[in-house]
């Protein structure tokens, strides 16, 4: 019974270490800065939409309101 506990404790300890190393490796990959996060992608999409579409949309609305088309 005691050897079983030692074996389980050893497996738990080794598993904890390997999980910790995997997490560190994953964090190191994320620090590269090469991949954009979801939030950055959303911001860029919103910015592109504002810069490209809204001025045209406002021109169309003004054109229809004032019948200057």
UniProtKB/Swiss-Prot annotation:
Expression (tissue specificity): Expressed by the skin glands.
Compartment annotation: Secreted
Propeptide positions: 19-43
Signal peptide span: 1-18
GO biological process, alphabetically ordered: defense response to bacterium; killing of cells of another organism
Highest taxon listed in the record's lineage: Eukaryota
Keywords attached to this entry: Amphibian defense peptide, Antibiotic, Antimicrobial, Cleavage on pair of basic residues, Cytolysis, Disulfide bond, Hemolysis, Secreted, Signal
Disulfide bonds: 63-69
A single cellular component GO annotation: extracellular region
Protein family according to the UniProt entry: Belongs to the frog skin active peptide (FSAP) family. Pleurain subfamily.
Role played: Antimicrobial peptide. Has activity against the Gram-positive bacterium S.aureus ATCC2592 (MIC=15 ug/ml), the Gram-negative bacteria E.coli ATCC25922 (MIC=60 ug/ml), B.dysenteriae (MIC=120 ug/ml), H.pylori NTCT11637 (MIC=30 ug/ml), and the fungus C.albicans ATCC2002 (MIC=30 ug/ml). Has little hemolytic activity on rabbit red blood cells.
Protein's name in the database: Pleurain-A1
Annotated organism of origin: Nidirana pleuraden
């Amino acid at each position: 019974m005691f050897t079983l506990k030692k074996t389980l404790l050893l497996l738990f300890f080794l598993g904890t270490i390997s999980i910790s190393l995997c997490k560190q490796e994953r964090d190191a990959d994320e620090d590269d800065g090469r991949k954009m996060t979801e939030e950055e992608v959303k911001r860029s999409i919103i910015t592109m939409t504002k810069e490209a579409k809204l001025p045209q949309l406002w021109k169309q609305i003004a054109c229809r309101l004032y019948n200057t088309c």
